[in-house]
Structure formats: structure tokens, C-alpha cells
Amino acid sequence: SAASDVYKRQNLFYYAQFLVMDYPNEIYELCANYIREQCAQATDRRLYKKVCKDLLQLIKWKGNATAKLLVDEFKATYPRRSALLDELQKVERKL
């Protein structure tokens, strides 16, 4: 449900900020799985922006390589989602 998704994101990103320094790869992987799931379910620009906001957080945590993999993966998987591709370009500028 949408409510449990919000809760899951809040928990994941809240705890990740404390753990990312000591366990970067584990945190990047958890975040990547969550972002992947969200992107698969996203249907409009508002939701694509949320996906990209999470990608930008990953970059802030030095997860550039993971963010780049996800951006490339989403571009290949969803070539017809023009609004998503548009939002992903904004993330790419920060990589």
C-alpha cells in the first residue's frame, strides 16, 4: 500500500544516514532495491520525481556508481516513459 511504502522509505533513508559511512555497499544495495521497486510502480512525473530524489540522496552518500547503474537501467527498461527520461537527465547532471 502507499502508506506502507512511505513508512518503508522513511525508515530506510532515516537509518541509512547513520549506517552509510560504515556499511556503504549494503546501504547502496538496499536503497537500489527500494528505488527499483518504486520506479517499476511509478506512473507519472510526480512519482518519477520521487524516484529521482532518492537517486540524488544516493549520490549525496557517495553512491554515484549505484545511481549511475540505476539511471542506465531505467533508461533501458523504460525507453517510452518520456517524463521519466526527462527527470533522469537532471540526475545525470549531478553524477
Name each region found by the language model.
Residues 2-7:
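Short, small-residue-biased leader/transition segments that mark boundaries at the very start
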Residues 35, 43, 49-95:
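C-terminal non-catalytic interaction modules
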Residues 8-60:
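Structured C-terminal portions of repeat-based eukaryotic scaffold domains
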